[in-house]
Amino acid sequence: AARLAAFLPAALHVGFPLTVRELVSLGRTCHLAGVFESARDRESVASAMEFSGVAQFADRRYTELSAGEQRRVLIARALAQESRLLLLDEPAANLDASQAVRMLDGLASMARRDGVSIVAAMHDLNLALLVCDRVMLLNQGAVVGFGTPEEVMRYQALKDVFRCDFYVGRNELNGRLFVVPMKSPE
């Protein structure tokens, strides 16, 4: 199963003083033939750390990193697994705006290039609209809409789910939808 799907948890408590490289290497566990890492395992770990921008932290302890750096390490661990399906819980959590856009754009490009499917739970609607070609809108666990952003992210659906007004517009620079939650007029 681990070869089929990789999971990025919302948070991970690491009780051992693992280095970044050691933690990312745990993503390769499902590929190990015996106890020792292969050259392919080391290559996959290095590539995943480079993609996630954490290669410079390889020998640092995971617990010494900032929350955003830890997030990128966990993304690298999921990528090192080389699964065909990535299940990502809040992949942009604790990342600043530029890191979030770069990471999500990189993941979307990788998905298109390598045929990897990505399912991501995201609360930042605008980040989702920036990179997702399909979105699912949930209301207390029930599916309210599934389809293209244009089909799903409509004013009334957003208002019903989040119980506030929204402005739904189109970015003139990139043509993508964006949403702005608004205080209801009094």
Name what the model sees in each region.
Residues 61-65, 69:
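Conserved ABC ATPase signature
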